């Protein structure tokens, strides 16, 4: 996953070493949990995000991270989403949807662009409450994007956070 790896690194905000995975559930010390996607996805240890996943066939990567400080939570969703995708060149926003999910503000953005000269598609989801900003990113080559998009949507929908 040479081409999508740099984007994952470029979009990360924090690292936390005390997270754990039990019975297919990722538990963050920041108070949220996620169900890991199914077949073919592997956890990449030692990344800058709390959770990074990679799939080799078809190629793709996803991550989850949270930032829990007053400064970040005060920023608009659009700004937070742009920060997630700084490493994307020749960016084109395909779609942006803002709504509320589970008492949290949410923005989902679908983009296309390039990483290391390779065309990729990116889906970025930002959830925000009074305590934290939760970031989710899926990136894959354009021709492999749809193959993993359902896994990403299920991954994001499995989010369970701490009481707001």
Where do the PLM segments sit?
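C-terminal motif of bacterial Sec signal peptides marking the signal peptidase cleavage site
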Residues: 13-15
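Conserved polar/disulfide-associated segments of primarily extracytoplasmic proteins
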Residues: 43-135, 140-142
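Post-signal peptide N-terminal segment of mature Sec-exported envelope proteins
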Residues: 24-48, 52, 56
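Bacterial signal peptide processing site
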Residues: 17-19
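Surface-exposed amphipathic alpha-helical segments
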Residues: 38-41, 88-90, 134-164
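Sec-dependent signal peptide recognition
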Residues: 2-9
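Short glycine-aromatic motifs
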Residues: 21-24, 32, 40-43, 88-91, ...
């Amino acid at each position: 996953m040479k081409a999508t790896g740099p984007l994952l690194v470029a979009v990360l905000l924090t690292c936390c070493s005390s997270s754990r995975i039990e019975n297919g559930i990722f538990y963050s010390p920041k108070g949220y949990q996620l169900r890991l996607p199914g077949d073919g996805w592997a956890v990449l240890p030692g990344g800058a995000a709390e959770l990074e996943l990679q799939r080799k066939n078809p190629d793709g990567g996803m991550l989850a991270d949270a930032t829990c400080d007053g400064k970040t939570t005060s920023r608009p969703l659009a700004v937070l989403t742009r920060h997630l995708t700084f490493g994307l060149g020749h960016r084109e926003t395909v779609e942006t949807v803002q709504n509320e999910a589970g008492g949290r503000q949410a923005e989902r953005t679908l983009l296309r662009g390039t990483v290391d000269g390779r065309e990729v598609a990116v889906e970025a989801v930002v959830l925000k409450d009074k305590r934290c900003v939760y970031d989710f990113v899926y990136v894959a080559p354009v021709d492999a994007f749809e193959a993993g998009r359902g896994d990403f949507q299920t991954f994001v929908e499995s989010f369970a956070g701490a009481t707001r």
